[in-house]
Amino acid sequence: MRGLLARLWGGRASVSREPDARPGESGAVVSGERWLVVGLGNPGPKYAGNRHNVGFMVVDELAAQRGERWRLHKAHAQVVETRVGDAPVVLAKPASYMNLSGGPVAKLSAFYKVPVDRIIVVHDELDIPFARLKLKRGGGSAGHNGLRSITASLGSPDYVRVRVGIGRPPGRMDAASFVLQDFSTAERKELDVHVARAADAVETVVTSGLEKA
């Protein structure tokens, strides 16, 4: 998959070179440790095609690739328990609205005993053009209410972010209206590959570390 995506998109996602997830002295990821991969979005069919829901789309892709089905967890989230390489992974979609995502994420982190440094959050990013990705660990919320809620609930910003570019709104459209619109017809023609590329990046973080994604 990675070779095909590289040809289609002109190379890898741009990655912020920050400390790797649970590195040993060599910088390698410790295999067999559980990860929590959270896609952000708003629940319900009304929002399913929105730009703001691209995080849901990415974890849906990861679940579909493995033939897994979602189930409701008591932490108020849809979850899938699966594997990526040798690592057990919990995929999650909070069942709360975006600005309340932190509660379910913190509860899942506690339930599955996953520390902050093995949490990956996949979210839409206005400051990155559509069809581009950037990955980093930590940082601020940049106005993203889902990230703000997660950071507050976890008590730390030091989780990995897979920032899926949706671009800026045209003209004078406000950002809130833009993110709650469905992807345009032109964007939808490329969306499947964009989502698959983000899913591929998540897998690489889990199996090889942030610097290899």
Curated annotation (Swiss-Prot):
Its EC number is 3.1.1.29. The keyword Iron-sulfur does not apply. CDD domains: PTH (cd00462). The record marks 42 as: Discriminates between blocked and unblocked aminoacyl-tRNA. TRNA binds at residues 47, 97, 99, 145. InterPro entries: Pept_tRNA_hydro, Pept_tRNA_hydro_CS, Pept_tRNA_hydro_sf. Disulfide bonds: none annotated. Keywords: Cytoplasm, Hydrolase, RNA-binding, tRNA-binding. It catalyses: an N-acyl-L-alpha-aminoacyl-tRNA + H2O = an N-acyl-L-amino acid + a tRNA + H(+). It is an enzyme of class 3 (hydrolase). The record marks 124 as: Stabilizes the basic form of H active site to accept a proton. Pfam families: Pept_tRNA_hydro. The active site is at residue 52. One of its GO terms (cellular component) is cytoplasm. It is found in: Cytoplasm. SUPFAM superfamilies: Peptidyl-tRNA hydrolase-like. One of its GO terms (biological process) is protein quality control for misfolded or incompletely synthesized proteins. One of its GO terms (molecular function) is tRNA binding. Belongs to the PTH family. Hydrolyzes ribosome-free peptidyl-tRNAs (with 1 or more amino acids incorporated), which drop off the ribosome during protein synthesis, or as a result of ribosome stalling. Monomer. This is Peptidyl-tRNA hydrolase. It comes from Thermobifida fusca (strain YX).
